[in-house]
């Protein structure tokens, strides 16, 4: 009995060293409750009114000083997946982009730089590992490469690169993501 008690007594003080031995990009989640934002259901309803379909993923990110819900919605009309962004303070849709494949003729005819060049531009500014990449066509006809980068300093950032100029259009810190990309 004493032997077991002695082993437990020695183990308890060192257990915390192993329990928190990982990087987390969710450290800022407690800050979200300080935002004055609409319910996610309100923005989801707005997104469904814009693109009828099925939500596959939800991301919460900060664009400038605005909190944004971004939904990936698989359209019941054409089967494409759309990224629908909703301003979480105001509750209205601010952007819609259609995800397209690598062989999309419209995207390929308009894009002037390769996805590899766009990726190197993004990583040069935000060093880390690209964990996902997409080709998107905006409702205004704009062509964008989108990269999710797990940065070397521990947070995830979403970087949009203009497929015509190669310039970074925006880079936004992603606070959380629920769901998965369609395979």
Where are the model-predicted features located?
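Long, terminal "pre-/pro-" and other extracytoplasmic accessory regions
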Residues: 2-8, 16-183
